[in-house]
């Protein structure tokens, strides 16, 4: 069975690794272009490419900035794949590719809920306790293809990176099961009336305000752990926090000095700050921040 694989982050790598381990023929891999990362803007390959270079360097790798060209569709046809497997690739496939062979997408939600680019972050933001992975036969619409199978997972008290890691392993097992039993599966139509969409995450989504509730800020911290993180209006990044209480106080002020840092009163509760980073400065433990600025209960940090 010949597979053309399309994926980019660690979530996709877990699936690709399982395909190799189960002796599927990976004819080619498509992933996003290398991107500059960090303050020094070092050109960095995506996780899928790193894995291939380390473990399967003979596998053809393609990194088109635009997948919607006739040349790409022609190149895929040359590999004569039995399936195209897609997992968090990062580009929408054109009809010319979808018509080559069955295209199976491993989407990180239980469809039709959270169609779109940020299903894991959206599930965390909405306080979902259970989500999962759906294997779907791709069509022309956005994540609206027929369902081939799904696996449920608990996500309560997990942050984005933890959910991605967990879902990667779940998706890998589901993918193998679907491919091995594809001819015996009766696809299930999605109920569009139950659908919801999620947007692509922007850097500005990480902004938190003292007028946000403690639960909202905690959810944002968990959802945006990898990127963009959360930050105050003055640009201070909150690198480690936890919900402290539901006690209502005048928000925006320091409400407690704790052994690990300090608490801030926000709408409907308090959050404890453990580590933070002011603009153009190094990250610092919250207790050192408090001591260095000689802040006390009732003071504001911005």
Swiss-Prot record:
<dbReference type="GO" id="GO:0005829">
    <property type="term" value="C:cytosol"/>
</dbReference>
<feature type="binding site">
    <location>
        <begin position="109"/>
        <end position="112"/>
    </location>
    <ligand>
        <name>(6S)-5,6,7,8-tetrahydrofolate</name>
    </ligand>
</feature>
<protein>
    <recommendedName>
        <fullName>Methionyl-tRNA formyltransferase</fullName>
        <ecNumber>2.1.2.9</ecNumber>
    </recommendedName>
</protein>
<dbReference type="InterPro" id="IPR005793">
    <property type="entry name" value="Formyl_trans_C"/>
</dbReference>
<dbReference type="InterPro" id="IPR011034">
    <property type="entry name" value="Formyl_transferase-like_C_sf"/>
</dbReference>
<dbReference type="InterPro" id="IPR041711">
    <property type="entry name" value="Met-tRNA-FMT_N"/>
</dbReference>
<comment type="similarity">
    <text>Belongs to the Fmt family.</text>
</comment>
<dbReference type="InterPro" id="IPR044135">
    <property type="entry name" value="Met-tRNA-FMT_C"/>
</dbReference>
<keyword id="KW-0648">Protein biosynthesis</keyword>
<dbReference type="Pfam" id="PF00551">
    <property type="entry name" value="Formyl_trans_N"/>
</dbReference>
<dbReference type="InterPro" id="IPR005794">
    <property type="entry name" value="Fmt"/>
</dbReference>
<keyword id="KW-0808">Transferase</keyword>
<dbReference type="InterPro" id="IPR002376">
    <property type="entry name" value="Formyl_transf_N"/>
</dbReference>
<dbReference type="Pfam" id="PF02911">
    <property type="entry name" value="Formyl_trans_C"/>
</dbReference>
<dbReference type="GO" id="GO:0004479">
    <property type="term" value="F:methionyl-tRNA formyltransferase activity"/>
</dbReference>
<dbReference type="InterPro" id="IPR036477">
    <property type="entry name" value="Formyl_transf_N_sf"/>
</dbReference>
<comment type="function">
    <text>Attaches a formyl group to the free amino group of methionyl-tRNA(fMet). The formyl group appears to play a dual role in the initiator identity of N-formylmethionyl-tRNA by promoting its recognition by IF2 and preventing the misappropriation of this tRNA by the elongation apparatus.</text>
</comment>
């Amino acid at each position: 069975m010949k597979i053309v694989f399309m994926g980019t982050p660690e979530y996709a790598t877990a699936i690709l690794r399982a395909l190799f381990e189960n002796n599927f023929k990976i004819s080619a891999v498509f992933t996003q272009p290398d991107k500059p990362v960090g303050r020094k803007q070092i050109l960095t390959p995506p996780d899928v490419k790193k894995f291939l270079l380390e473990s399967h360097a003979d596998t053809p790798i393609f990194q088109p900035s635009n997948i919607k060209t006739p040349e790409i569709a022609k190149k895929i046809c040359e590999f004569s794949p039995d399936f195209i497997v897609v997992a968090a690739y990062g580009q929408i496939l054109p009809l010319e590719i979808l018509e080559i062979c069955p295209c199976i997408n491993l989407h990180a939600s239980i469809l039709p809920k959270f169609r779109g680019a940020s299903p894991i972050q959206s599930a965390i933001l909405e306080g979902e306790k259970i989500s999962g992975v759906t294997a779907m036969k791709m069509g022309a619409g956005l994540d609206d293809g027929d369902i081939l199978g799904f696996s449920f997972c608990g996500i309560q008290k997990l942050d984005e990176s933890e959910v991605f890691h967990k879902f990667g392993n779940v998706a890998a097992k589901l993918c193998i099961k679907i491919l091995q039993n594809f001819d015996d599966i009766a696809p299930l139509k999605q109920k569009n009336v139950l659908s919801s969409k999620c947007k692509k995450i922007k850097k500005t989504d990480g902004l938190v305000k003292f007028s946000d509730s403690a639960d909202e800020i905690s959810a944002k911290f968990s959802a945006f752990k990898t990127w963009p993180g959360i930050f105050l209006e003055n640009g201070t990044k909150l690198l480690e926090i936890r919900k402290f209480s539901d006690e209502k106080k005048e928000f925006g002020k320091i409400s407690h000095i704790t052994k690990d840092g300090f608490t801030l009163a926000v709408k409907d509760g308090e959050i404890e700050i453990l580590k933070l980073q002011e603009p153009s400065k190094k990250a610092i433990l919250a207790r050192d921040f408090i001591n260095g600025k000689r802040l006390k209960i009732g003071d504001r940090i911005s």
